[in-house]
């Protein structure tokens, strides 16, 4: 299924007030959004940033099961978009004493993304989906720039607070 697919990565995960989480996926050419629930957005962020977890999450458990059974997550493919719903496939390579084969399993894109990040497996989107989605690169750049500006303002406020704490009132 590598023919007709485009390599992508998770570019950003942003919480959208009262609507869940926006996962920005794409490459240097284009970016699109998949909305997921806030918990899944948090899991994807944890895998993306390599944040350690006290106990295994569901996707960690799946990864441990894959490891125990000599199953490798070869790649994930976001392969369809129907009525604003994305569909995806896990491409697994089984190579153990019982089986030697490649399997495709239908899965939610959010689970595919989390598992790909956890297993450091490549992610792809079908050409059909790629051509159908709207490019959100400018939106992501705008949001990122706004967040950076807010962060800079927060740092300036904190510095002002420190000056006030250390030397009286800031003017």
Q: Which positions does each model-derived feature cover?
A:
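Divalent-cation
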Residues: 1-171
């Amino acid at each position: 299924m590598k023919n007709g697919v485009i390599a992508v990565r998770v570019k950003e995960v942003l919480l959208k007030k009262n609507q869940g989480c926006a996962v920005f996926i794409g490459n240097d050419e284009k970016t699109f959004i998949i909305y997921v629930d806030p918990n899944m957005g948090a899991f994807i962020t944890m895998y993306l940033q390599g944040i350690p977890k006290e106990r295994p999450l569901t996707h960690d458990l799946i990864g441990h099961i894959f490891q125990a059974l000599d199953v490798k997550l070869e790649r994930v493919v976001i392969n369809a978009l129907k009525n604003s719903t994305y569909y995806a496939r896990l491409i697994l390579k089984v190579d153990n004493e019982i089986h030697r084969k490649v399997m495709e399993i239908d899965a939610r894109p959010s689970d595919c993304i989390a598992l790909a990040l956890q297993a450091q497996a490549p992610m792809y989107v079908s050409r059909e989906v790629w051509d159908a989605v709207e490019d959100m690169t400018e939106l992501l750049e705008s949001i990122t720039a706004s967040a950076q500006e807010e962060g800079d303002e927060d740092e300036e406020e904190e510095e002002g607070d420190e000056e006030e704490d250390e030397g009286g009132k800031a003017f």
